[in-house]
Amino acid sequence: MPLMKFKPTSPGRRSAVRVVTPDLHKGAPHAALLDSQSKSGGRNHHGRITVRHVGGGHKQHYRIIDFKRNKEGIPARVERIEYDPNRTAHIALLCYVDGERCYIIAPKGLKAGDQVIAGANAPIKTGNTLPLRNIPVGTTVHGIELKPGKGAQIARAAGAAVQLVAREGIYATLRLRSGEMRKVPVECRATIGEVGNDEHNLEKLGKAGAKRWRGVRPTVRGAAMNPVDHPHGGGEAKAGQGNPHPVTPWGVPTKGYKTRKNKRTQQFIVRDRRG
C-alpha cells in the first residue's frame, strides 16, 4: 500500500504520513459484532492511576474478534476488510456457509471474495487455521495459541509474523520477530500467513493531538519532576538523573533490567530475545 503525504498547510499536516487503504470498507461495521466499552483513564476501582499515559481519546465500539477459529470444516467467504480502532491490524468480516458471521484478524493478501477454512485438514493457504502439527516446518504463521483451545495470543499486531522452525514430540519451536525462540504445544492452532497492514510502522501522526485522539497522554521525563514524584527529580536547573543507573518511578532499574517473574514457563523459552 502506498504512503500519502499532505500539503504543508500546517506543521501537523507537513509532518503527517498516512497509509493509503482503498480496499477498506467505507461503511458502518457489522452491528451484531459490536460491543460497548468505557474509558478507565488508567484508573482502578479506587480511582488511583495504575497505567500511566492513558486518558481521553475518541469513543469506540469494541469489535468482537474470533480468536479461536473453532468452526471446523465449514468454509467461509470474506465479505470485506475493515478498519478496527482498537488494534493496529485490519479485520476481515467472514460469512460462513451456514450464515454465521464473525471478524478475524486480516492476514496480508486476504481480500474480499476469498474463501478460508479452519480445521486439522485445511489446506496450507493464507487465512486458513490449523494445528501446528499439520503445518509444514518453515511456514510463516500468525495468531498462535499458547494453550490449545484458548485462542490466538501471539502475533496479532499489524505486520506480525512467526516462523515455525522445528517440531519435536509434543512441542513445536517458533521463531518470533523479536528473535525469541519459544516452544508451543503442537495441538495449538495457528493461522497461515502474516498479519496485514504491515506498513503501519511507517505512519507518522504529525501532531500531538493525533496521539490524544487515540487516548495517549504525554510522557514527562523523571528529571523534570520533583524529588517526591520520581527518583530522578529535583536539583537546580538542568540536573542529571543523580543515579548510577536510570530507574522507573518506583525505583526499579530500567534499560535492559529483566523483570520477568514467571519461572514456571521459562522452560519453554529456548532462546531469549536479547540473544
Swiss-Prot record:
Gene3D superfamilies: 2.30.30.30, Nucleic acid-binding proteins, Ribosomal protein L2, domain 3
GO molecular function per UniProt: rRNA binding; structural constituent of ribosome; transferase activity
A Pfam family that the UniProt record links to this protein: Ribosomal_L2_C
SUPFAM superfamilies: Nucleic acid-binding proteins (SSF50249), Translation proteins SH3-like domain (SSF50104)
Cellular component, GO, one term: large ribosomal subunit
Keyword rRNA-binding: yes
Entry's Gene Ontology BP terms: cytoplasmic translation
Bridged cysteine pairs (disulfide): none
Region (Disordered): 224-275
RNA-binding among keywords: yes
Keywords for the protein's UniProt record, in alphabetical order: Ribonucleoprotein, Ribosomal protein, RNA-binding, rRNA-binding
Protein task: One of the primary rRNA binding proteins. Required for association of the 30S and 50S subunits to form the 70S ribosome, for tRNA binding and peptide bond formation. It has been suggested to have peptidyltransferase activity; this is somewhat controversial. Makes several contacts with the 16S rRNA in the 70S ribosome.
Family, as annotated: Belongs to the universal ribosomal protein uL2 family.
PANTHER family, per the entry: LARGE RIBOSOMAL SUBUNIT PROTEIN UL2M, RIBOSOMAL PROTEIN L2
Subunit relationships: Part of the 50S ribosomal subunit. Forms a bridge to the 30S subunit in the 70S ribosome.
Listed name of the protein: Large ribosomal subunit protein uL2
Organism: Xanthomonas oryzae pv. oryzae (strain KACC10331 / KXO85)
